[in-house]
Design a protein with these regions (language model features):
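Asp-based, Mg2+/Mn2+-dependent phosphohydrolase catalytic module
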Residues: 1-4, 8, 112-217
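Catalytic-core regions built around general acid/base machinery
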Residues: 91-102
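N-terminal helical cap/lid subdomain that shapes the substrate entry/recognition surface
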Residues: 2-93, 112
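Proline-centered loop/turn at the N-terminus of a beta-strand
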Residues: 104-106, 181
Length: 217
């Protein structure tokens, strides 16, 4: 069956997101042992990732559990979002842009409350693809089989008609179990080359000539 849609992860794929050491710096500043910050915030991080709590709830939990005043809270949250958002993988984003209208395009992201607004402001993802499925809005996260079904339903395609690109092995494995054609992202040239091979083998091809494209990523 011909490929009709291509879906991309965000962090580590459409965004270049190296570890900036934010957690470690704040642990040192607050006198916490290694891993202590995430231990205190674990349930808030988990709730924020599937939308069971609001962004305001997260801020309140940070204030109370880390003992931050308003100025410290503002700096801490800004640090977290700077690391979360990273920088644009411009080469891949341009490739995604040119897949339309020949293919339906989507984003499937394990996210956090507030991510849609911040990523739209930074990168305009809502204008880049046809559909975005965020874990914090859908109440489930990769590799839950239901979230792969959801993105296919939103794009009005079957899983066998869909290519999915992610940098996490478990998310790639989950997509394959769900019947999607999944690619483990390593860099732009590799990922685009594998996408192009799948599109060509399905009898269509993108016609973009990006088989050896490079760029961020």
């Amino acid at each position: 069956m011909a490929i009709r849609a291509v879906v991309f992860d965000i962090g580590g794929v459409l965004e270049v997101t190296p570890d900036l050491g934010v957690t470690q710096r704040w642990e040192a500043r607050l006198g916490l042992p290694g891993g202590g910050l995430d231990e205190r915030m674990h349930d808030a991080w988990a709730g924020g990732s599937i939308g069971t709590i609001t962004e305001q709830d997260v801020h309140q939990a940070v204030r109370e559990r880390l003992g931050l005043d308003e100025r410290q809270l503002e700096v801490f949250i800004a640090d977290l979002w700077r690391e979360y958002l990273g920088t644009a993988n411009t080469g891949l984003i341009e490739y995604v842009r040119q897949l339309r209208p020949r293919y339906r395009t989507g984003i499937l992201s394990n996210s956090f409350v507030g991510a849609r607004e911040k990523e739209q402001a930074a990168y305009g993802f809502e204008d880049l693809v046809d559909e975005i499925v965020y874990s914090h809005e859908s109440g489930m996260s990769k590799p839950d089989a239901r979230i792969y079904t959801l993105v296919c339903e939103r794009l009005d395609v079957g899983p066998e008609e869909t290519v999915f690109v992610d940098d996490a092995d478990r998310c790639v494995a989950g997509a394959r179990l769900g019947g999607l054609h999944a690619i483990r992202f390593q860099d732009n040239a590799q990922a685009i080359g594998e996408i192009e091979r799948l599109l060509t083998s399905s009898g269509v091809g993108s016609g973009l000539g990006f088989g050896t494209a490079s760029g961020n990523g």
